[in-house]
C-alpha cells in the first residue's frame, strides 16, 4: 500500500529532523557537550536523504511533509519534553494531517 509507505517515510523523516534539531538545541541552549553535534549532523543528513526518497515532485513532498512534521513535533513535546498536548494542539495536528493527505493522495489529472 503506497499510502502507508508514504506516511511511514514522512514519520521517519520527521523524527530524523526533530532529533537533529533537538541535539543542536541541547548544545546551544542547555550547555550540553559539543559532541552532540556529531549525531545532530548525522540525523540531519538522514533527514535530507529521506526527503529525497519520495517519488513525487519535491514541492508537493515538502508541503505535505509539513503536516506530518507538526504531528511529530506535538508528539515530541509530549514524550520528550513531558508537556501534554492541549485539545487545540491535537485539533491543529489533525487538520495538518488532513492537509497532508489531500496534498499527497488526491487524484491527479496530470
Curated annotation (Swiss-Prot):
Q: Which SUPFAM superfamilies does this UniProt record tie to the protein?
A: Multidrug resistance efflux transporter EmrE (SSF103481)
Which residues are listed as membrane-spanning? 7-27, 33-53, 63-83, 87-107
Q: Which cysteines are joined by disulfide bonds?
A: none
Note the Pfam families from the entry.
UPF0060 (PF02694)
**Superkingdom field:** Bacteria
The cellular component terms of Gene Ontology attached to this UniProt record, alphabetical and capped at eight, are: plasma membrane
UniProt cross-references to InterPro entries, sorted A to Z: UPF0060
Entry-linked NCBIfam families: PRK02237.1 (NF002586)
The family annotation for this protein states: Belongs to the UPF0060 family.
Which named protein is this? UPF0060 membrane protein Noc_2955
Amino acid at each position: 500500500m503506497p499510502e502507508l509507505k508514504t506516511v511511514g517515510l514522512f514519520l521517519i523523516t520527521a523524527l530524523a529532523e526533530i532529533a537533529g534539531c533537538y541535539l543542536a538545541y541541547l548544545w546551544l541552549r542547555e550547555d550540553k557537550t559539543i559532541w552532540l553535534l556529531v549525531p545532530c549532523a548525522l540525523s540531519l543528513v538522514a533527514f535530507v536523504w529521506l526527503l529525497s526518497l519520495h517519488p513525487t515532485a519535491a514541492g508537493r513532498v515538502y508541503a505535505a511533509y509539513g503536516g506530518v512534521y507538526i504531528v511529530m513535533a506535538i508528539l515530541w513535546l509530549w514524550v520528550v519534553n513531558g508537556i501534554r498536548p492541549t485539545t487545540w494542539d491535537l485539533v491543529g495536528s489533525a487538520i495538518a494531517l488532513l492537509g497532508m493527505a489531500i496534498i499527497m493522495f488526491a487524484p491527479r489529472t496530470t
